[in-house]
């Protein structure tokens, strides 16, 4: 079977650059034999930077590029010349990318906006040259400050799609059919469970040039929050939706029970999901007459806007758009920042195994050769970097 192009989970080894060393150069000129120290400062090591890019919507471009390394700062030189800063390594990621420490599960950062930049790992600061250490009693210091060490970390990048409306339902509930009917998205549609194996996004056009984004999430089954079916892999994409459209087919044995099972799966995965506004759509309603709709109406969940629709015949689609637009524009339904919690280490290891990301990514590298300007023997004098 062909490998999916939708990648929403990768593990990457990141390493910032180390700072360049300060120079110990002594000024030696024809008419200035005792010119004193003139060693320059070392350059800053390169940062590891994450940048949001709306042109990406998966992490596929990172799947086969698992090592991100910034350049080292160059050493200072004579005439108090600063060393060149190391090149930053910029990692382009889709908006909605969350980053965790792969070893501890600690939450690190969240990139949500196009062009947003986050420094994941800072490069080491350059060391001070010997010109900084000249004093009244120490006219020719033969030492300089070493550059600050680099930082390295293996991280997990996890994508949570940004959409206004998330479609929630069991397999074959008609989610993909609805998305294809009201947007230009063309998800695969077939009459068997789990036709949709990855999320699909569609832009739904509304009146007066207005629009909103809808996400078709692969079908949930009872026990998905414990890993059954497609498991919790795609449940995280619902976290960023400001409104959830629950879809239950009209031929379901018990519409209310099916809705409550879906609700319970979301509650188990993340209780905060229940704070989102919900709308219930009874799909495939072209098989119902008005009398049957009237009989079903009293059995539906209270306090949840509901509508009978058919994506094939167009029944209720226009009204559904009105309901969704109205709910989306309520102040209480604006997308809020997600509270990201650290991952449990034990569950993290199992998660990495399930996602096929349990391979070690440590990187072997060679130390740079010593490129000092002179051959003087000196000892580094460690400085308190925090007070520099």
From Swiss-Prot:
The GO annotation for biological process reads: ribosome biogenesis
What keywords does the record list, in alphabetical order?
A: Cytoplasm, GTP-binding, Hydrolase, Magnesium, Metal-binding, Nucleotide-binding
Q: Which cofactor does it need?
A: Mg(2+)
- The UniProt record gives the binding positions of GTP as 169-176, 194-198, 216-219, 283-286, 310-312
User: Do you know which InterPro entries this protein is assigned to?
Assistant: G_OBG, GTP-bd, GTP-bd_Obg/CgtA, GTP1-OBG_CS, GTP1_OBG_dom, GTP1_OBG_dom_sf, OBG_GTPase, P-loop_NTPase
The record's section on Pfam families has: GTP1_OBG (PF01018), MMR_HSR1 (PF01926)
State the compartments where it is located.
Cytoplasm
| Superkingdom classification of source | Bacteria
Kindly list the positions annotated as binding Mg(2+): 176, 196
Q: Which GO terms describe its molecular function?
A: GTP binding; GTPase activity; magnesium ion binding
Residues annotated as domain OBG-type G: 163-329
Q: Could you say which enzyme class this protein belongs to?
A: hydrolase
Query: HAMAP family of this UniProt entry?
Result: GTPase_Obg (MF_01454)
Return the similarity comment: Belongs to the TRAFAC class OBG-HflX-like GTPase superfamily. OBG GTPase family.
Q: How does it assemble?
A: Monomer.
- Name the chain's protein: GTPase Obg
């Amino acid at each position: 079977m062909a490998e999916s192009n939708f990648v929403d989970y990768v593990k990457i080894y990141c390493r910032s650059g180390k700072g360049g060393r300060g120079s110990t150069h002594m000024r030696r000129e024809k008419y200035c034999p005792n010119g004193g120290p003139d060693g320059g400062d070392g350059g800053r090591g390169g940062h590891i930077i994450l940048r949001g890019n709306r042109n990406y919507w998966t992490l596929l471009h990172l799947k086969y590029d698992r090592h991100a390394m910034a350049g080292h700062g160059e050493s200072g030189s004579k005439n108090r010349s600063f060393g060149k800063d190391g090149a930053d390594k910029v990692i382009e990621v889709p908006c909605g990318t969350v980053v965790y420490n792969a070893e501890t599960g600690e939450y690190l950062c969240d990139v949500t906006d196009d062009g947003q930049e986050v420094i994941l790992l800072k490069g080491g600061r350059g060391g001070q040259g010997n010109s900084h250490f000249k004093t009244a009693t120490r006219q020719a210091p033969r030492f300089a400050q070493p550059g600050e060490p680099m930082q390295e970390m293996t991280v997990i990048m996890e994508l949570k799609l940004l959409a206004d409306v998330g479609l929630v339902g069991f397999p074959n509930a008609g989610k993909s059919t609805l998305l294809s009917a009201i947007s230009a998205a063309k998800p695969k549609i077939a009459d068997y469970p789990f036709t949709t194996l990855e999320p699909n996004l569609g832009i739904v056009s509304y009146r007066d040039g207005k629009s909103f984004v809808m996400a078709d999430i692969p079908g949930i089954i009872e026990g998905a929050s414990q890993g059954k079916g497609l498991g919790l892999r795609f449940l995280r994409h619902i976290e960023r939706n400001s409104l959830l459209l629950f879809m239950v087919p009209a031929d379901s044995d018990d519409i209310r029970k099916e809705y409550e099972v879906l609700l319970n799966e979301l509650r188990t995965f993340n209780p905060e999901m229940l704070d989102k506004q919900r709308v219930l759509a009874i799909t495939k309603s072209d098989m119902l007459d008005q009398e049957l709709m009237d009989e079903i109406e009293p059995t539906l969940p209270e306090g949840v806007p509901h509508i009978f629709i058919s994506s094939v015949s167009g029944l209720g689609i226009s009204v559904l758009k009105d309901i969704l637009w109205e709910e989306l524009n309520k102040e209480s339904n604006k997308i809020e920042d997600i509270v990201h919690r650290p991952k449990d280490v034990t569950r993290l290891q199992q998660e990495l195994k399930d996602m096929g990301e349990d391979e070690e990514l440590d990187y072997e590298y060679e130390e740079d050769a010593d490129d000092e300007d002179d051959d003087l023997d000196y000892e580094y004098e460690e400085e308190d970097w925090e007070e520099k």
